[in-house]
Amino acid sequence: MKTLSEFIVERQAEYPNAKGELSGILSSIRLLAKIIHRDINKAGLTNILGQSGIENVQGESQMKLDLFAHNTMKAALMAREEVAGFASEEEESFIAFDTERGRNAKYIILTDPLDGSSNIDVNVSVGTIFSIYRRVSPIGSPVTLEDFMQPGNKQVAAGYIVYGSSTMLVYTTGHGVNGFTYDPSIGTFCLSHENMQMPKEGKIYSINEGQYLKFPQGVKKYIKYCQEEDKATHRPYVSRYIGSLVADFHRNLLKGGIYIYPSATNYPNGKLRLLYEGNPIAFLAEQAGGVATDGYRRILDIEPTALHERVPLFVGSEDMVKKAQEMMEEFKE
């Protein structure tokens, strides 16, 4: 069975001018995945569950594991010096790696270090999301905010790690999506899901229906559509919502479905972050044959205006996302 290391080397060999920087970043992420996998698996036995008592830049209480994952990723990237800078959902500003190697590095990375961390103390799947861009500031100088404020269509790689019944690393470099399952007996990620494709049609819708009254009319209509009985379209669909974006998206990637986190009266711009969640998940979805929009626009074409900008997200099987967007358009003001 092919390992992640072998796969990365093979892909790098397809580009004669490649110098291995991107491969080095992926190796750092692989290391991060192993460390977080180890600590999550013993979370109930160590003092890393619960709240840290600190709020992040969004005013949300940070879980202890959020901070652990954030600090672990920052340390792994700084040690390898393969990136010029790093931005995290858990930090107010970006971090420039202001060393000689850091200033001469070509890439920057944005991450949600631990998505769904509020679920960890009840043993529900969580994940890490990452997004990699080529910097736009001059090589040899420290990175600037402009390097991080790029639309998703400029990503060179993106992926996630899902920590569940097994730990999987799923990523794309713009040439399809591949998944690697961690074998703890040998400490290696092995290629288990080659060229992943999201079904064009799906039967699963994932949304927090407890917030129904706060949703836009187009979303309410789509939920009712999913619940109606119609043999021709195999409805009603199945409702499945874990509350962890990575876990919900991973299931829908494999089985077909739609994940929706819309705007709401209490979150008029949506709740998910464009740069840390929306763009990388959208890149993966499109590379697997799916679609990702904010209800009206392609996610990857949105020009960011702030490092922690929020965005509504409709992502999944093509037919389902297009139907939801059609209903959103009906009520567009």
From Swiss-Prot:
Cofactor mode of binding and number, as noted: Binds 2 magnesium ions per subunit.
GO BP, sorted A to Z: fructose 1,6-bisphosphate metabolic process; fructose 6-phosphate metabolic process; fructose metabolic process; gluconeogenesis; sucrose biosynthetic process
Residues at which substrate binds: D115, G116, S117, S118, N208, Y241, K271
UniProt organism field: Haemophilus influenzae (strain PittEE)
UniProt main location, coarse: cytoplasm
SUPFAM superfamilies in the cross-refs: Carbohydrate phosphatase
Family note: Belongs to the FBPase class 1 family.
Binding-site list for Mg(2+) 2: D112, D115, E277
NCBIfam families in UniProt: PRK09293.1-1
Keywords annotated in UniProt: Carbohydrate metabolism, Cytoplasm, Hydrolase, Magnesium, Metal-binding
UniProt name for this protein: Fructose-1,6-bisphosphatase class 1
Single GO MF descriptor: fructose 1,6-bisphosphate 1-phosphatase activity
InterPro entries given in the database record: FBPase_C_dom, FBPase_class-1, FBPase_N, FBPtase, Fructose_bisphosphatase_AS
Enzyme Commission number(s) from the entry: 3.1.3.11
Cell compartment(s), UniProt: Cytoplasm
Binding site for Mg(2+) 1: E89, D112, L114
Keyword Metal-binding: yes
